[in-house]
Amino acid sequence: MSEAIIAKKAELVDAVAEKMKAAASIVVVDARGLTVEQDTVLRRELRGSEVEYKVIKNSILRRAAEKAGLEDLASIFVGPSAVAFSNEDVVAPAKILNDFAKNADALEIKGGAIEGAVASKEEILALATLPNREGLLSMLLSVLQAPVRNVALAVKAVADNKEDAA
């Protein structure tokens, strides 16, 4: 193999390792058997949620995982592998891929990594059941607003009682 090809592959390993280090979550799938139309729809959905989806050779993925400190992830790089990286939303890749897999039997989730820790297929599927980032933020906001709303209602009730008494 020529030195130019080796250098190019080394650059690719470095680039993938950097993506793995920077990613909030990584989901590895076996997309063998998806039609071109299904793959196009899947890629569009992932892109809409700012999730990067790539089919990368297993040898490159193994080396990149080792370089990124995710050595245990290397064991799932068997057979055709596609990888979804998300830097912002931890839940998005798992949720989109899991929802898509329900309608496309050919797509199989293999495992991944969450916040730099290797995750099994079961953990990725559990992550997929959580609401997305916006949903979690709205839940948090409603929990934070509830005490303030209750105090405001209590103050209003006291004011109404004083008006009625006067």
From Swiss-Prot:
One of its GO terms (cellular component) is large ribosomal subunit. GO terms for molecular function: large ribosomal subunit rRNA binding; structural constituent of ribosome. One of its GO terms (biological process) is translation. PROSITE patterns: RIBOSOMAL_L10 (PS01109). Keywords: Ribonucleoprotein, Ribosomal protein, RNA-binding, rRNA-binding. The keyword Transport does not apply. It comes from the Bacteria. The keyword Ribonucleoprotein applies. SUPFAM superfamilies: Ribosomal protein L10-like. Disulfide bonds: none annotated. It holds the Pfam family Ribosomal_L10. InterPro entries: Ribosomal_uL10, Ribosomal_uL10-like_sf, Ribosomal_uL10_bac, Ribosomal_uL10_bac_type, Ribosomal_uL10_CS_bac. Forms part of the ribosomal stalk, playing a central role in the interaction of the ribosome with GTP-bound translation factors. Belongs to the universal ribosomal protein uL10 family. Part of the ribosomal stalk of the 50S ribosomal subunit. The N-terminus interacts with L11 and the large rRNA to form the base of the stalk. The C-terminus forms an elongated spine to which L12 dimers bind in a sequential fashion forming a multimeric L10(L12)X complex. This is Large ribosomal subunit protein uL10.
